[in-house]
Amino acid sequence: SEPYVMGSHATCSGAWVSGPEDISPPEYYWGYNRMMTVQGLFGAGDTVGGSAHKFSSGSFTEGRLAAKAAVKYIEEQKAKNIKVSDEQCEKFKKIIYKPLENYTVGRNEITGGTVSPSYISPIQGLQRLQKIMDEYVGGISVNYMTNGNLLKKGLELLDWLQEDLENVGAEDYHQLMRAWELKHRALTSQCVTEHTLFREETRWPGYYYRGDHLKLDDENWHCLTVSRRDPKTGKFTMEKMPVYHIIGDEEKKKAS
């Protein structure tokens, strides 16, 4: 069982990326192999969805494919109009280093132990995230079982955690790294919970079970599910995407 996201390495979950030009249907291809829906951003390994159990061999192979496509993207001058101003850099520096400021301002408010009224530490947020995902999103403590009501409650608690993570504090650069790891993990967990709620079936028995939809439902859910998150509101929109079996039965027979 993995922390934060149960069965994460085997659920095919991850970013939606373009497939290779030679075999991808139109819905799976938009210009460059392994490029995400954000132009110029490429992914590989566990970052990318659509394939389970990549392990190190699959991940570094996919990394090589993504790197070659990124180089091609640059060589074809697709990135020539990308401009980054000093003002943008300063803005992001303030965002990145904010946990250090939160700690510096709030540390003198602690009267005992490690609990501050104005910030939470990365370890405190991490423990909350683990508890939410374990108890509400089908972790080992509940025998990998969840349901619609539990998932909705989990999303409510994850929303509260996201609010508190605006005030995460870091006493040094190592804790700053931990703070940003926590922010990214919390967002990933939120996304997985939204998808688990949206998919009303049990697609991967053994990794999680929807107690209110225990059976596999190919009639309604033989598909991919994709989401978009509004960066301003934090709200997700969900939709289904078709699954194309690019390698058909005849090819499988030949391969075996």
Model-derived regions, located:
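Core active-site phosphate/anionic-ligand binding loop and the adjoining beta-turn-alpha structural block
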Residues: 1
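Short loop/turn motifs at secondary-structure junctions and domain boundaries
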Residues: 5-9
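Glycine- and aromatic-enriched mobile tails/lids
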Residues: 10, 22-256
